[in-house]
Amino acid sequence: MLTLPSRLASARLSGALVTIDKNEEPINLQAAYSIQEQVSEILGVSSEAWKVGSTSIEAQRKLGTTEPGAARVPKQFKYTDGAAIPVFPDHDLWVEGEFALRIGIDLPPREQPYTHEEILTAIDGVAPSLEFVGSRLKGGIGKSGRFNATADGGANVALCTGKIMSNWKNIDLSTNQVDLSLNHKVVASGLGNKALGNPINVMTWLANHLRSSTGLRAGEIVSTGTCTGLVKVSAGDQIEANFGVIGKIKAHLINAVIR
C-alpha cells in the first residue's frame, strides 16, 4: 500500500477518498505538519500563498480545535479572480470569504516573537479571496479531526485571490463587511473580526508559527480565515464575495478531470 502522504497527494488529483489506518494517524500536530509537508513535496512546486484556517469559532468547532492551523497552497490549486475552478464531488466542498494579506518584506525565522506592530508594517496589500475547503478523507471535514485535517493540507481545496489594494491602512479590517453570494444570491455575511478578532492578528499568528522554520517571504500572500462561515458548494455553482471598498471576487466551479 502507498504511504499516507502519497495517497493524500494522489487524492487531490484523482478525486479519490482516503482512509487513514490507526497505525498511520498523526499522533500530534508536529506529526500532522510533517505529513502535510511530504504531501506538498509530492505535489511539486508550491505557490506563494498560505492559508490559515480555524480562525473563527465556527471553523474551530467544525474541526474540533481551539487554535488556528496553516498550510502552503500548492501551485496547481491557486487561482485568480474569475477563474473556473475544477472540483471533485466526493471532497465535501465548502467556500469561505476571506481577507488575503500580502507581505512586503521578509519575516525570517528568529527567536523573538513578532509583534502586531511589526506585522502591520510588513503588510503591503490586502485583497478579497475565496477559499474552497473540503476533505480527501472518508467522512468529510466534520469527522476528520484536527490532526488529520492538518495532514490533509489544512482542508484546502483551492484558493482564489483578487486584485491587491495597496492603499488600505486607513481601513479597519475588523469592521469591514464581507457578503458572500451563491448563484447570484447573498447567502452569508460577516465582518473581519471573525478572523481572530482582526485579519492582522491571523498574520501575526502565522509569522510566529513559522518563525522556527521557514519564516515568511516578501510577496507571499496569506488567506486569513473565514469571515462568512462555511457555505456548501458543488460543481456548476457561481460564487462571488463583495468586500466593499476592498473589492469583489468571483469564481465558478466545474467538474474536475482526473489527473
State each model region's role:
Residues 226-227, 233-241:
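Low-complexity, intrinsically disordered Gly/Pro/Thr-rich segments
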Residues 244-246:
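Beta-strand-rich extracellular modules
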